[in-house]
Amino acid sequence: MTRGKPGRAGHDRRHASTGEHGLVIAAHGRHYLVERKGGGLLQCFPRGKRSECAVGDRVIFEATAVDQGVVVRVEERRNLLHRSDQFKSKQLAANIDQVLIMLGTEPGFSEDLLGRALVAAESLGITPLILLNKIDLTARLETARARLALYRALGYAVVELSVHAAPEAAHAVLAAHVAGRSSILIGQSGMGKSSLLNLLIPGVDAQTREISEKLDSGKHTTTFTRLYHLPSGWGHGGTLIDSPGFQEFGLHHLTEGMLERAFPEFRPRLTECRFYNCRHLQEPGCGILGAMAEGKIDPRRHALYAQLLHESEQQKPW
């Protein structure tokens, strides 16, 4: 019998047995910054053409120089948060416990983006936490609260704070939510994410510069996702992942079945549909449409579901 060449899985296992364990703490294109288990940072590249790592991944890597290496294998993930559109898919973070969705009273926040972020978290079984910042700017505070009433009624926690005007109070309330957890901070630009990072992570600007230099991303310090360890003095560990601000949150990768279960108010009604393959759009005997007619499901939420379902049906090259 002729022995064939070892497959990729065997190849990776063989290399993994001699590699080191590390944590991906930053990603920019195909460049990754990996933190060694015993300390120290290396710039690493994936083996092969595809970029398969995400910030928060635990990996096996081989050092190829004092400060460089190659990722041999990504260890099994608990979850992977990513966004996608019709043309590409972008990994945001892996192995996270919580999604912090940063909003502000001013400028006005996108309710569409909020809804999509909640759906993304729900689809993975990850806890979302809505942060309403800039509550000291009272001109639009009540409007913001009114817009968030729907989400409070659905059971989503909303934390109100003012990072700029009341930093000590903001620090206290946020520390209680992030200590001991791996959280990712997402949101539109202008909501106060940078101020929040400076509040929670001492020396964050210096860390960001170091990461940027090691990734060779130069001045593009806001275009990569990065992980920060929470202060050891908190006594509970934990990490905070910061992602670049964005204006869209595509979820083209979610299937019809994943979408309908990512709306918590839909779940109790799914068994009431007359047809097993009901799409909850215009089918007779639909439990979701019936609940909406009774005022138990908000039309805005159903409109978001319908839009996401339409997007999921678009042909994708990835």
Swiss-Prot record:
Cofactor note: Binds 1 zinc ion per subunit.
Residue span(s) of domain CP-type G: 84-249
Region (Disordered): 1-21
Pfam (any one): RsgA_GTPase
CDD domains with a match to the protein in the record: S1_YloQ_GTPase (cd04466), YjeQ_EngC (cd01854)
Entry EC no(s): 3.6.1.-
Enzyme class: hydrolase
Predominant location: cytoplasm
PROSITE patterns named in the record: ENGC_GTPASE, G_CP
Binding residues annotated for GTP, in chain numbering: N133, K134, I135, D136, G187, Q188, S189, G190, M191, G192, K193, S194, S195
Record-annotated disulphide pairs: none
Gene3D superfamilies: Nucleic acid-binding proteins (2.40.50.140), P-loop containing nucleotide triphosphate hydrolases (3.40.50.300), Probable gtpase engc, domain 3 (1.10.40.50)
Gene Ontology CC annotations of this record: cytoplasm
Keyword Transferase on entry: no
PANTHER family: SMALL RIBOSOMAL SUBUNIT BIOGENESIS GTPASE RSGA, SMALL RIBOSOMAL SUBUNIT BIOGENESIS GTPASE RSGA 1, MITOCHONDRIAL-RELATED
Physiological role: One of several proteins that assist in the late maturation steps of the functional core of the 30S ribosomal subunit. Helps release RbfA from mature subunits. May play a role in the assembly of ribosomal proteins into the subunit. Circularly permuted GTPase that catalyzes slow GTP hydrolysis, GTPase activity is stimulated by the 30S ribosomal subunit.
Family: Belongs to the TRAFAC class YlqF/YawG GTPase family. RsgA subfamily.
Name used for this protein in its record: Small ribosomal subunit biogenesis GTPase RsgA
Species of the source: Ralstonia nicotianae (strain ATCC BAA-1114 / GMI1000)
Species lineage: Bacteria, Pseudomonadati, Pseudomonadota, Betaproteobacteria, Burkholderiales
Name of the coding gene: rsgA
